[in-house]
A protein has these predicted regions:
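Metal-dependent nuclease catalytic regions and adjoining charged, substrate-binding loops involved
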Residues: 6, 186-193, 198-285
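Short histidine-centered catalytic/ligand-binding loop motif
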Residues: 46-49, 98-105, 180-191, 233-235
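Short acidic (Asp/Glu) and glycine-rich catalytic loops that position anionic groups and cofactors
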Residues: 38-41, 174-179, 222-228
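A residue-level signal for conserved active-site and pocket-lining positions in enzyme catalytic cores
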Residues: 61, 157, 244
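Secondary-structure boundary elements
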Residues: 123-132, 159-168, 204-212
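Coil-to-beta-strand transition motifs
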Residues: 148-152, 164-167, 222-225
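Metal-dependent nuclease catalytic cores that hydrolyze phosphodiester bonds in DNA/RNA
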Residues: 1-152, 265
Length: 285
């Protein structure tokens, strides 16, 4: 598959991440990496590595959304006496499953994933957002109006366009905490503000729809698997748009010049963070 026109497409996860745009495209995760360092972005693009830390997230997505990578149970008789996947039989099974595009997990992890999915679908607002007519794992592609750089986005749940309603795109996340007060720190740490603005910008282009919103459905990875629905507000949207613009411009410049720099080649003078100073203050007499 080769993408040459803006639009919303159906494709599997592997095709999307392989980048089907002939001229190359930039995703929101790539944008967040390029803001750290263009050199890091270029290295990761040329040396992709699958991280099994994402296995649970992929499995929960597939269970809730009904699309995605298939989950397969690692046979109990291949495990070590302590339940570890350190035996040759277990390693061979895992390698074969990954080669087939599946997510290999132990039975207890699969049971936990099923419970997480049930928690999401038992949440009235989360369920309502996910059950609207639409497309799961929708792949969107459109060029940036300012630079011509192709942008791509993969939205977990994209509702069908409705002339009388607002388009609320959904991203499903698993994490340590779904507490909204803690999620705002995660949003800042992991660049979810950029992700939200990125997805909406691409969506507005392919649908010509200015009335969009983006929410996160967050489910905790430990029991009782609490769920919350969160929309980023305050200055998050503007910060996200600013970071998005900077990432696209940086990508465009690097591609035009063929230079993907790392950190500036100077001596970097750093001062201790405030928390470290407080930890080491002399106690009051």
């Amino acid at each position: 598959m080769s993408i040459t026109a803006p639009g919303i497409y159906e494709m599997d996860d592997a095709t999307y991440h392989a980048d089907p745009v002939e001229a190359g495209s930039l995703s929101s995760s790539g944008a967040r990496t390029i803001l750290k360092s263009p050199a890091l972005y270029q290295w990761e693009r040329q040396h992709p590595v699958y991280k099994d830390v994402y296995d649970v997230g992929h499995a929960v997505h597939a269970k809730v959304l009904g699309v995605g990578l298939d989950t397969v149970e690692i046979p109990a008789d291949t495990l070590a006496a302590n339940g570890a996947t350190s035996t040759k039989a277990a390693k061979d099974f895992i390698a074969q499953a990954r080669a087939e595009g599946k997510v290999p997990l132990k039975a207890d992890v699969i049971a936990e994933i099923n419970t997480m999915a049930e928690s999401v679908l038992s949440h009235p607002l989360a369920r309502a957002l996910l059950e609207r007519p639409g497309q799961s794992e929708a792949s969107l592609f459109a060029p940036d109006p300012e630079t011509g750089v192709w942008l791509r986005a993969r939205i977990d749940r994209l509702p069908d366009a409705h002339p009388a309603g607002r388009t609320i795109a959904v991203d499903l996340k698993t994490g340590r905490s779904a507490d909204p007060a803690e999620f705002k720190r995660s949003a800042a740490d992991y660049g979810y503000d950029l992700q939200a603005e990125w997805y909406q910008a691409v969506l507005r282009q392919v649908r010509d729809d200015d009335d969009t919103a983006f929410v996160f459905i967050v489910v905790e990875s430990t029991a009782p698997h609490l769920v919350s629905v969160i929309e980023l507000g305050g200055t998050f949207p503007q910060i996200g748009r600013d970071r998005m613009r900077r990432a696209i411009d940086t990508f465009h410049h690097c591609r035009e010049t063929g230079e993907w720099p790392g950190y500036d080649p100077v001596v970097h003078y750093v001062e201790p963070p405030r928390y470290y100073e407080i930890q080491n203050e002399e106690p009051a007499a």
